[in-house]
Amino acid sequence: MSSNGIGLQTARGSGTTGHIQKNVASNKDHASIKDDKSGHFRRRQLSNDRKLKYDKHISTRNNRDEAKQEIRSHDLKRDVEVKCMELRDALEDESEEELTIEKKVNELRDKLLNSPMTARKQTSLDDRKSDSSHASYENKINDHKDNDNASKNDIEDSFSYKRRYTDCDEKGERLKIRR
């Protein structure tokens, strides 16, 4: 019956079940602000503290979102540079001149950075399985937004296989089944 050393060791002989209850009457921290008659200053101070805490929460969330965007753009630029280095290595193996190599590498870099695929951030990272937690987070948010915009029919179509096909007739209309 004892929990963390609180309460009876055993309920035997005590005439009780040994159930332990928390005494919330003695806790003054949980009194609501409206019931607090200690004064206007104290209520206003508590209200301001809540507002500051909320503002701090919003600012940290915005900072995290900005950091995620910066990381994604850095990953994108890094992939572009990897492709440029691969081209440079291939051209150096073919014994091209340095000026020609620089020109071709710069053309490829400009092409990759200015392409519409890159602008939409859909590079080779999206083609393969994403190793980046930030990319998977962005995809999850986009999927969630798409689901929010779905119509009622789309939502009904997304029910599980068992529910869709076992409770419907040949025309796809729901059967009234009592369970």
From Swiss-Prot:
Where is each CWF21 domain found? Answer: 72-115
| SMART domains in alphabetical order | cwf21
Gene3D superfamilies hit by this protein: 6.10.140.420
Q: Which CDD domains match?
A: cwf21_CWC21-like
Does Cytoplasm count among this protein's keywords?
yes
- Where is this chain compositionally biased, Polar residues type? 1-26
| Superkingdom per UniProt | Eukaryota
What is the predominant subcellular site recorded for this chain?
cytoplasm
Q: Which stretches of sequence are listed as region Disordered? A: 1-72, 113-159
Supply the alphabetized keyword list: Coiled coil, Cytoplasm, mRNA processing, mRNA splicing, Nucleus, Spliceosome
**Localization, UniProt:** Cytoplasm; Nucleus
Q: Spell out the Pfam families in the cross-references.
A: cwf21
Positions the record marks as coiled coil are 59-157
Any one GO biological process: mRNA processing
Q: Name one GO cellular component term.
A: cytoplasm
| Database matches in InterPro entries | CWC21, mRNA_splic_Cwf21_dom
Question: Where is there biased composition of kind Basic and acidic residues?
Answer: 27-39, 46-72, 123-132, 140-155
Presence of the UniProt keyword Cytoplasm in the record? yes
Q: Which PANTHER family match?
A: SERINE/ARGININE REPETITIVE MATRIX 2, SERINE_ARGININE REPETITIVE MATRIX 2
What is known about its subunit structure? Associates with the NTC complex (or PRP19-associated complex). The NTC complex associates with the spliceosome after the release of the U1 and U4 snRNAs and forms the CWC spliceosome subcomplex reminiscent of a late-stage spliceosome.
Instruction: State the family named in the UniProt similarity comment for this chain.
Output: Belongs to the CWC21 family.
What job does this protein perform?
Answer: Involved in pre-mRNA splicing. May function at or prior to the first catalytic step of splicing at the catalytic center of the spliceosome. May do so by stabilizing the catalytic center or the position of the RNA substrate.
Name under which the protein is recorded: Pre-mRNA-splicing factor CWC21
